[in-house]
Design a protein with these regions (language model features):
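Serine residues within intrinsically disordered or low-complexity segments
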Residues: 19-21, 26-28, 36, 43
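A generic local structural motif
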Residues: 5, 28, 125-127
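N-terminal, polar/charged subdomain of small-to-medium soluble alpha/beta proteins
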Residues: 34-137, 143-145, 149-167
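Short, intrinsically disordered, low-complexity terminal segments
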Residues: 1-7, 19
């Protein structure tokens, strides 16, 4: 049985004033974040994410910038107002086979790194859930010393992502 909101807030406050386990405390603080963030792998040179929250396009662009790279290519796939012969589309709903999305993205990045060894930073982020008209559903970013490798790798990644990732 759930207490009234005011009583729950008071209980939560008291719980924080006594000794609480890290798990108990993190659940109350991180609950909304865990609900919106499904899966992320992020390192110095790879950022893969499946998220129910809006994608951080500008953060991805800034992250991909490297002092040894003269090119950063960022592709954003947005929700448009038509799909095939359907017009008046206002939103899309994405579902994912979550356990397989990030491992598949890792494999695609490995393919790209073999084909274009000069690429440095690679990001592939995709939304789940409702994505409104004009919002980003997917972001791919690649940085490289030269634009030809960055463009080619980014095009390869988005094409393979759309064809093979279980979304």
């Amino acid at each position: 049985r759930r207490a009234a909101p005011q009583a729950w807030e008071a209980t939560r406050w008291r719980r924080r004033t006594r000794s609480v386990s890290p798990i108990e405390d993190s659940e109350s603080v991180l609950g909304p974040l865990i609900d919106s963030l499904i899966r992320v792998i992020r390192s110095d040179d790879t950022w893969l994410e499946l998220s129910g929250a809006p994608l951080p396009v500008e953060d991805v662009r800034r992250w991909a910038i490297r002092p040894d790279c003269g090119a950063v290519v960022v592709f954003c796939g947005t929700t448009r107002d038509h799909a095939g012969d359907r017009v008046g589309v206002t939103e899309l709903h994405y579902e994912a086979y979550e356990a397989h999305v990030v491992p598949r993205l890792e494999a695609l990045v490995a393919e790209a790194r073999i084909a274009w060894p000069a690429i440095r930073a690679v990001a592939a982020l995709h939304r789940t859930g409702k994505v409104a008209l004009g919002e980003e559903a997917v972001v791919v970013a690649v940085s490289s010393a030269h634009r030809s490798e960055a463009f080619a790798a980014a095009a390869h990644l988005i094409d393979r992502l759309k064809a093979t990732v279980p979304l």
